[in-house]
UniProtKB/Swiss-Prot annotation:
Record lineage: Bacteria, Pseudomonadati, Pseudomonadota, Gammaproteobacteria, Pseudomonadales
Signal peptide (UniProt feature, chain positions): 1-30
Entry binding sites for Ca(2+) 1: 600, 602, 604, 608
Annotated source species: Pseudomonas aeruginosa (strain PAK)
Effect on the protein of changing residue 600 to A: Abolishes integrin binding and calcium binding in the first site
Effect seen on changing residue 600 to K: Preserves integrin binding
Keyword tags: Calcium, Cytoplasm, Fimbrium, Fimbrium biogenesis, Membrane, Metal-binding, Signal
Function: Involved in pilus assembly, twitching motility and adhesion to host cells. Primes type IV pili (T4P) assembly and is required for inclusion of minor pilins PilV, PilW and PilX to the surface pili. Stabilizes assembled pilus fibers likely by antagonizing retraction mediated by PilT. Calcium-binding and calcium release by PilY1 seem to be essential for twitching motility and for regulation of pilus retraction dynamics of PilT. Adhesin for human tissue specifically recognizing a host receptor localized or enriched on basolateral epithelial cell surfaces.
Subcellular localization(s) per the UniProt record: Fimbrium; Membrane; Cytoplasm, Cytosol
Key word Metal-binding present: yes
Family the UniProt entry places it in: Belongs to the PilY1 family.
MF annotations from Gene Ontology: calcium ion binding
Region span, Disordered: 329-352, 1138-1163
Top-level taxonomic group: Bacteria
Protein name according to UniProt: Type IV pilus biogenesis factor PilY1
Amino acid sequence: MKSALHQIGKTSLAAALSGAVLLSAQTTHAAALSVSQQPLMLIQGVAPNMLVTLDDSGSMAYAYAPDSLVNSRNNVYFASNSYNPMYFDPNTQYKLPKKVTLSNGQIQVQDYSKPSFTAAWRNGFTQEGRVNLSRDYRPTVQYQGGSGAGTESSIDWYGAPAFYYQYSGGRGCSLTTSSCYTRVEISGAAQQQNFANWYSFYRTRALATQTAANLAFYSLPENARISWQLLNSSSCLIGSGSSNCYNNYLRDFTGQHRVNFFNWLENLSVGGGTPLRQAMTRAGEFLKKTGVNGPYAYRPGTQTSPEYSCRGSYHILMTDGLWNNDSASVGNADSTSRSLPDGKSYSSQTPYRDAASNTLADQAFHYWATDARPDIDDNIKPYIPYPDQANPSAEYWNPRNDPATWQHMVTYTLGLGLTTSLTSPKWEGSTYSGGYDEIAAGRLSWPNASNNHSNNVYDLWHAAVNSRGEFFSADSPDQLVAAFQDILNRISGKDLPASRPAISSSLQEDDTGDKLTRFAYQTSFASDKNWAGDLTRYSLTTQDKATVQTKLWSAQSILDAMPNGGAGRKIMMAGSGTSGLKEFTWGSLSADQQRQLNRDPDRNDVADTKGQDRVAFLRGDRSKENSDNFRTRNSILGDIINSSPATVGKAQYLTYLAQPIEPSGNYSTFAEAQKTRAPRVYVGANDGMLHGFDTDGNETFAFIPSAVFEKLHKLTARGYQGGAHQFYVDGSPVVADAFFGGAWHTVLIGSLRAGGKGLFALDVTDPANIKLLWEIGVDQEPDLGYSFPKPTVARLHNGKWAVVTGNGYSSLNDKAALLIIDLETGAITRKLEVTGRTGVPNGLSSPRLADNNSDGVADYAYAGDLQGNLWRFDLIAGKVNQDDPFSRANDGPAVASSFRVSFGGQPLYSAVDSAGAAQAITAAPSLVRHPTRKGYIVIFGTGKYFENADARADTSRAQTLYGIWDQQTKGEAAGSTPRLTRGNLQQQTLDLQADSTFASTARTIRIASQNPVNWLNNDGSTKQSGWYLDFMVNGTLKGEMLIEDMIAIGQVVLLQTITPNDDPCADGASNWTYGLDPYTGGRTSFTVFDLARQGVVDSKSDYSYNKQNVAVSGTEQKGLGGLTLSTNEQGNPEVCSSGECLTVNPGPNTRGRQNWRPIEGKN
């Protein structure tokens, strides 16, 4: 072959390239929900500074990597991805970039036009210079764009149909043996389009970098702060704001600034040397800048103060070459003793030191070890993913950790086409693998770097280590995309501090003789331990009038000690046969399921052949951990965040109350049989499974829902940490007894929350023979969103048992609907869709069902939506006998057609704050009988805590607890809504927050008002229709909200609120547990909580307020996940939040629970 240089006409690299791999070609909706894949309580409110440096040197025009391949340009293997990784790879899907613009203040996104195979653009961004790839293709050696004519160096003067060479390998073959390659012409519409995409957007280093950076940065949140620069352009320096660099001031990554960044990427032109050290200097010195355009300004460009001292700063440095033609002046920083800003002393040590001065590594160490802003506090969060409590010094100097609390710069370096040069120390795919151990142990030294020296390739690796960042080496376009995304995930991970344990808990009671022995199952997770989780069993006893927990076992420890790499685990998935299940093994997977697992999550889901190893990894095999394709786990058991355990032992219901529901079912016989059932505890985890454990902590069963299968492979990624976290089976399992198929069964309903859009039902009657009843996903119900709502199992008037649930959030059409699902078959019995505001995302939340006449059959359902509407649904016949409106005499399948949205399709109430803004409802309402015995008081709270933006406390408005009187609950035709507003309700307030001591127990408490509600006028007409309580103390807004289910017991309603931290430099959230009068929403007339921790509730737990002792309305408690109702050893009710239980008084003359279900947790 011959090489040719020819003119291709006027061309530049201008275009509009933008895109995220997962987005469709449709214009994005500005109001679309952003469901977080990270636990919000760990997210800080301060976004990091991100400084991006891209290489614009002349070698970025090359269509090969590494540089040495130019000498092989006339050989056939130059046109093979096996030899030249920049060349077309038939196994890689080359995704089109997207164009980002701003229209009417909203970001708009659309796909770039597909390049045609018969008229493909040489530069896909400028859409200039076309080539007919079906006949005129010539492999590119170098492509140089610019404002004038573009030039291209290519192989052979004579065009041909597009092709690649396939390496056959085999005996006697090497990558440079021409006879071992077979020429393959591009054929078929799909492959031709893929080749055209590669040719127009990926075939050179520059084009691949533009596309890869765009695909990675597209998903960066809008609150990130970003500036950018090139190596060679004097008018494109970090933070300069130059118009020639698209106004690259440091700004929030939103609006026009976001568009500017993508425009800068799209207009990248190349030419010049590789002055990496000058670029590093500009980035490091920029962090020292003060003022309104500085890196610590509150709103850069607008407002300087307050300057948050916890804001991290990261430098992303991408290059394809070795630094040259520049200088630095930091000396041999990594070999010079010095005092660090936190008082620690550094002396020359591995793996930081070397013998050379003024290297990139020296600069990286200097800008890590120097306090960029000594005038502000040192509050950067330490990042310690590898703790070493036995040796704090080793922990501090482990470069995988970043203990620096001062303002400093962490650098991530990315080399393109350099891997084959990294031989001593040897690069093996990640910063701390390969030859790194030799460096750390002192058996090898970092090669000395100097101007334009071949050793400078190691300086990129060394620099990343010295700054507590990471080095990435990519050789192909798909690796480049993955590397950029990995870097952003690592930064997000460092921005996510370690978690606290015991996020949720569930209590199990167990009767043994005349003594009540109590057990608690607590879940926990640790983001700083590679997203490990645990389920722990405790016994609960009372000592000195306080509840004491004694740890019995840890499911994590038992599972991790399991022999044979998980081979013996019973992990099931949907299958055929009588059980509806099959083993999760490689051989049992369908071809499509194998394809899904044959994807490399570290390389942008490129196809590979590691699927069988991924199955083994997910089953618990740890033999391949910490290799090129598999991460290291601290535990096989994944993080358990929002899923509360459910226990299954004896029958679920009280026999004498359940028997009349299905007279032919003989529940007493069923209940007697279940007395000997082996107890189990079920819980969902974000390792892709619902787990079942016995009472000794042994895993006996696991189930992988089909709705999470598509992203199972992500769990194996080396980059699965921090911001790469995904939710999987994150919902709380719901267990109930139900009658179908002529028999009673115990069923488990599973949901996923942010893990996916799906529901499933398992028959767990026999724990040794569990059956899958059904699964539902978007294919079966398009309006199913993320399954945040908690399902309810109920007998309905159509004569069938059903699962009743809200449709969830972020569904296809963003609608809200109540789903009624046949429990036995999974068929949708009815979908009751509600109205809402157009253009505003909606979704129905968890429902609460009402059984008006206590016959065990649901008559009404209540649920709220994201637009703040409280809905009622009539689950009764259209026409009823008013003398006996809920009679079961007319029950039958036809009744289902009469199920409807009450009040003519209008809400019972629409929640808005004092300014008229809608208040989202995401927790299930609670119901109490109205004191007049007419209807219900429907109690519900407002607040939303699942989008990324919800992590920061919203102190601009109040969320509210409401009690609304629904008077029309006797089966009458409720054809019109009461149309209530706040003006129809009695206001209550939180009047006091104080620190106090109750019999030596220190607490922070709150006192609510006690305003009476005047329900009726003298003539019996309605005067007030309820009450409301804004969550603020003396008018002070903290962002408090209600997102967990409440508990109504006796004459008190118990609830727990959450308040995201209003300090942007702190993670976490605070919680308040309230006990309020359900009839007024205010302070109770009796003492509710045993704040003195004496096992009973009396006046010792009162508080002196306005010269009298009053009941405390709320107390601050630790732990998230809502409240669990139980009983203590004295038989008194208590409410538990994670580790603390408080005895509660439900009020005087309180009757027993009027419900045919037993006390929660009773077996």
